[in-house]
Amino acid sequence: MKAIMVVGTTSHAGKSFLTTALCRILARRGWHVTPFKGQNMALNSYVTPTGGEMGFAQAVQAWAAGTAPRVEMNPILLKPQGNMTSQVILMGKVAGQTTASDYYEQYFKPGWEAIASALKRLAFEYDLVICEGAGSPAEINLKHRDLTNMRVAQHLGATTLLVVDIDRGGAFAHVVGTLALLDPEERALIKGIIINKFRGQRSLLDSGIKWLEDYTGIPVLGVIPWSEILFPAEDSLDLFERKTKPNGEININVIRLPRISNFTDFDALESEPTVSLNYLDLSQELGYPDAVIIPGSKTTIQDLSALHTSGMAEKLEQYANAGGIVLGICGGFQMLGRRVLDPNQIEGKQEEFAGLNLLPIETTILPDKITTQRQVFSNHPQSGLPVTGYEIHQGITRLADGVKNLENVGCQALFNDEKLGIVTHSQLVWGCYLHGLFDNGAWRRAWLNFLRHRRGLSALPTGIPNYREQREATLNSVADLVEANVNLSPILSQL
């Protein structure tokens, strides 16, 4: 099987960005391409049509390659839960949870078997696999249990690219140090170096690039300039690089929970020209935005506890009582209820925790995870709009004790499936389980128009395409940027 591997000198060097770009570039050139990341640690995930869970970044890469996401593209997904533990997703299904110290003993062998098996299946269907590493391939203390960097490259005999982030400083030292720490047979696979996130005059790098090529014997294939393209973030650290649009007509705050997950839900909102989207730490003042969103969480109870102890829960209550709009998605939806129950102590030792008491619901955390794609129709803010998305949650939400039906407590079903979400009659508090909600263009605009009407602003057109079409334009822009600044000929000639 022909293969290209992308590894980085550090985390956030640009591996996902470059892998995605290569998928789109080579797909446009006629290759039948698949992305692959053997092991990913991330809280942004996606559900395949068969109900398997995988990293959202690999789903984006699949779309870039013009193919459907499938769990073989990311056979191991680690979802941090706090307290140095992670949930292990193996071939799309929950396999258990583990600590960093126990992971190697428990999952190294089955993990590698899953990786090798997934690659074998993909080899039957695709011309080329473009693999992404994780972190650095030269972490000496972790190398013996590294499942996703040079072990994969050696298994495939992959033509390997080393990408470095020059914006953080020390790029030349990062490259030289990484290469020095690789084994000779690993280093021999590195066929090109790519410098990423460069700001400034390109010619100023020329002398450094010549020295680097002479010293390492490896060509620098390109310098990718810093870009403001809104590329889907892989983990919450990427949120610090996001810039809030100033002077938006509509201001929306997203609570940056300690264990925030699936914040790719808000890329579509961030793409709206009239919206200023701000990620708010728990220590910051809530202010008086047009809406506040409580996003998904990997551990609902721990993040709910953080809302209470930080004082943010009280601020949210005051904001809602003053007529503010609050929307919760997935874990955020669960937090809006009266209480969260954990009888099996899945998230911790506390079996019951008080919610924000903004919706008449309660949630019970259960061992089995629900992962499924959904197609429904909206009741609010406009009825009859088709809405697609996906569920990823460990818990069942129902009406609170003593509540017989929604109408009795001033609420309505948000969709034609009541279990997916509810909204108060006042339309001040919204909650739903549907990830990808804002990707639905007509629904997103209808909700924004509801906010705009409250501000006395004119309505925006609702007859717009879904965000997946905007994502396609983004993927083409990413590919165009890389194609214009990286010489791929030496790499492709070796395939």
Curated annotation (Swiss-Prot):
One GO BP: cobalamin biosynthetic process
UniProt entry tagged with the keyword Signal: no
All residue ranges annotated as the GATase cobBQ-type domain in the record: 249-443
Pathway the protein contributes to: Cofactor biosynthesis; adenosylcobalamin biosynthesis
Pfam families for this protein: CbiA, GATase_3
Similarity comment: family membership: Belongs to the CobB/CobQ family. CobQ subfamily.
Task performed by this protein: Catalyzes amidations at positions B, D, E, and G on adenosylcobyrinic A,C-diamide. NH(2) groups are provided by glutamine, and one molecule of ATP is hydrogenolyzed for each amidation.
Protein's recorded name: Cobyric acid synthase
Source species: Gloeothece citriformis (strain PCC 7424) (Cyanothece sp. (strain PCC 7424))
Gene behind the chain: cobQ
